[in-house]
């Protein structure tokens, strides 16, 4: 495995070294906020220009979804971030807890994908004997219940005193949302047949979106 980005204190700033496997909007955004870990257990946030250099090397990533987003991997080799470009330094453990909470709050995008797929699945029903109808009904009932759970999870995590139990419940809920989106988009593809694989058809796009959300803001609990 390639080493994550490390931050080493140097005169006038911090030196960043290591590998970032995922950076979006390269070639689009002017500045990027990069996080690196120091030996003292800190997370150091610094701003770097969105251009390649001898110390920052991008590698394009061919992706099945969001290919127009300019997503690359970045390798840092002695990239010095001046003190005036450092936007924050915080303890790693505190940052991890905050990041996990943020990543676990609310799954409206995932559930939106499921909702759209279910609506299209219902529209694809040929007659009253088509299994797409009962499948859409069952998925729709599950979606309604999941939306209610989403509200409850959001309420629990919004409490500053929320515990690891609440975070665990949120991770489990997120997994349920992802599974629902995948089952809904797969059912839609099965119902519409081979035409659903055409790039102009929403079925394949929704299936790819559901796949993307599996890795977006992924946490260890989520894996």
Where do the model's predicted regions map?
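Amphipathic alpha-helix face/heptad-repeat signature
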Residues: 106-110, 135-146, 173-177, 206
């Amino acid at each position: 495995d390639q080493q994550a980005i490390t931050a080493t204190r140097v005169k006038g700033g911090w030196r960043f070294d290591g590998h970032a496997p995922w950076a979006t909007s390269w070639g689009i955004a002017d500045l990027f906020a990069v996080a690196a870990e120091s030996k003292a257990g800190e997370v150091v946030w610094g701003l770097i220009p969105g251009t390649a250099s001898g110390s920052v090397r991008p590698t394009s990533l061919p992706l099945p979804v969001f290919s127009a987003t300019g997503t690359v991997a970045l390798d840092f080799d002695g990239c010095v971030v001046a003190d005036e470009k450092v936007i924050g330094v915080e303890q790693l453990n505190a940052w991890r807890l905050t990041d996990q909470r943020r990543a676990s709050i609310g799954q409206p995008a995932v559930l939106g994908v499921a909702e759209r797929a279910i609506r299209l699945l219902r529209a694809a029903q040929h007659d009253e004997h088509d299994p797409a109808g009962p499948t859409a009904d069952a998925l729709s009932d599950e979606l309604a219940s999941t939306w209610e759970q989403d509200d409850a999870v959001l309420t629990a995590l919004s409490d500053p005193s929320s515990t690891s139990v609440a975070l665990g419940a949120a991770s489990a809920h997120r997994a349920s949302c992802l599974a629902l989106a995948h089952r809904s988009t797969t059912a839609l593809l099965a119902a519409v047949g081979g035409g659903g694989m055409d790039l102009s058809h929403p079925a394949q796009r929704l299936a790819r979106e559901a796949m993307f959300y599996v890795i977006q803001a992924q946490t260890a609990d989520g894996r």
